[in-house]
């Protein structure tokens, strides 16, 4: 194999030196204390500041998984993410468990904060854009929750009373009727997407304070709509339903969808 060029060898040795220095860097020993409700977090440097403020050493009480980035997932100390506007690197994310519990109580009702385990509560509100996805994210939970909500929405349409008169055939023909197919025609007039409108779901999430506890990093903090906040709010609510189904079962998740989502949307 050809020898490394001088520039490549210097780069490799520099990276190795930086990695060794990072591995020997002492870790601050602090007790878990009440952290601010929100702090400024960028994708790299500010996340490290959050870890230094709330971290503990391995000899002390172990830190919760949601509160820090694993050491082996960190880079050698520099970032290749070049941002044209430095102001876009700053964003406020919640790190207060009490504030997160207040959201779950408001959205799920009394005792909602105790419905999920501590790690799952944080995972359900964490988007993959936060900390480059190194603390876990809710994509798979959102997929599961989306299927549950689609199923319950379809069921609500099929069991709803008929609001439209049947179409009269101008040729006097009589369509085939069967008890098992009596409710299928209701889907002609109302589709699940008509009820589960993404704008309505996002508005419901904002009303319950989801935007203040959701962990994500918008592309343009000055323009959340262009950064996809509506889609992120929808996927986060879906992920909460998926997490409930995962830990409490499908029956509980379906009841939550009917009582806490469909009922509030007027279905």
From Swiss-Prot:
This is Large ribosomal subunit protein mL57. PANTHER family: 54S RIBOSOMAL PROTEIN L15, MITOCHONDRIAL, LARGE RIBOSOMAL SUBUNIT PROTEIN ML57. Component of the mitochondrial large ribosomal subunit (mt-LSU). Mature N.crassa 74S mitochondrial ribosomes consist of a small (37S) and a large (54S) subunit. The 37S small subunit contains a 16S ribosomal RNA (16S mt-rRNA) and 32 different proteins. The 54S large subunit contains a 23S rRNA (23S mt-rRNA) and 42 different proteins. mL57 forms a heterodimer with mL44 and stabilizes rRNA expansion segments 1/2 at a membrane-facing protuberance close to the point of attachment of the ribosome to the translocon in the membrane. One of its GO terms (biological process) is mitochondrial translation. The keyword Iron-sulfur does not apply. It is found in: Mitochondrion. GO terms for cellular component: mitochondrial large ribosomal subunit. It comes from Neurospora crassa (strain ATCC 24698 / 74-OR23-1A / CBS 708.71 / DSM 1257 / FGSC 987).
